[in-house]
Amino acid sequence: MVKHVKENVDPISDEFYKLAEENENRWHLNERQLELLEGAKNKAKESGLWNFFLPNAETGEGLSNLDYAYIAAELGKNPLASETLNCSAPDTGNMEVLERVGTPEQKEKWLKPLLNGEIRSCYGMTEPAVASSDAKNISTSAELVGNEWVINGEKYYISGAGDSRCKIMICMVKTNPDAEPFRQQSQILIPLDTPGLEIVQPMTVFGQDEAPKGHMHIRMTNVKVPKENVLWGEGKGFEISQVRLGPGRIHHCMRSIGQAEKALDLLINRGLSRKAFGKNIINLGKNMETISRSRIEIEAMRLMVLKAAKAMDVLGNKEARVWISMVKAMVPEKACKIIDDAIQIHGATGVSQWSPLPGMYVKQRILRLADGPDEVHHHVVARAEVNSYELSNVRKVASNEK
């Protein structure tokens, strides 16, 4: 896999992204970009480097979450690498959902082309009018009329929906507002070309629209899809989101470690190659200490993520949720700090178009909001810790000893 990235992905990356800047239609990959991307994907397939993220040996490589952790950390060093192995978000989470709970018909129509890397997909959770980190707040409605779901509502920051290759959205909707709070939601498959579905605009991130994938604002007005498009049955939306978001969160953190590694390499390279006041700038101020702290933080993050991955393998996603929240609250924040330190040692170049660091920083900063903001994950961890204390007589006695 490392050889594939070095020989087939790194050499095409600069040309791929430069071509994107020249596109007349920024939401479509041009022929040369597709040629470069498909060439790298075909080489990955030929080498058996495909769908590593799926633990099912029939549809993926049969790797554990712990196995995949090492791979994803390497993929994180080049943003294009994951797509060449068909391991890109949000497709990975959507494929895992379809693989686990999709009907044979849903798998044939949507999972099969996703597994083959023929189409892309998106996931519709976040809404502009409510605090969407609490899934109970989701207000987009789906009413069953005859044999069709009629869907109304808005979603925004729907990652990847701007890409012309994106054909299907898994959408979180409210199907029964009178049910118990965690049984009100369902998830429904909505083709993006369905009448009534409108891509209103790309939402910007730090002023950038991130074409060609983007984060789109979507409005649905009387969108109709067949009754059979519901996933796993009505009222299962919250359970599906946990199936999907658990692995997704840890995959993001795995890739973040790769980004932190790359930032540290860039920091050291800059420090050794530039002089000021008669010295290499690596030897000025606290730069050596910064390098030390960065390496320590990277190794701490790596061990935490590996522990969370092992917990998922042994305990299951639900029982490992506290460990997943630990790494999700920890890793993007620390990766941001390491990238920020790398920017600082680069000076003005660190925030310019001549450096990959600005884009790296933006992606890590987004992760502190995506798939649950830091505060939600800290709350999950703290709640578990308080509950553990209250159930432990040993801890209570020890804390009261003088």
Per-region residue spans from a language model:
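Alpha-helical interface subdomain recognition
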Residues: 1-82, 88, 101-106, 113-118, ...
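Short, conserved phosphate-binding/catalytic loop or strand-edge motifs used
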Residues: 88-95
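Flexible, glycine-rich active-site loops centered on histidine and acidic residues
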Residues: 95-101, 123-124, 178
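A short, Trp-centered hydrophobic/proline-enriched beta-strand micro-motif
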Residues: 117-126, 170
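Short Gly/Pro-enriched turn/cap motifs at secondary-structure boundaries
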Residues: 129-133, 159-164, 177-179, 205-214
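Flexible, small-/acidic-enriched active-site or ligand-binding loops
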Residues: 137, 195-224
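Short, surface-exposed charged micro-motifs
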Residues: 139-141
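A short core secondary-structure module
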Residues: 148, 152-200
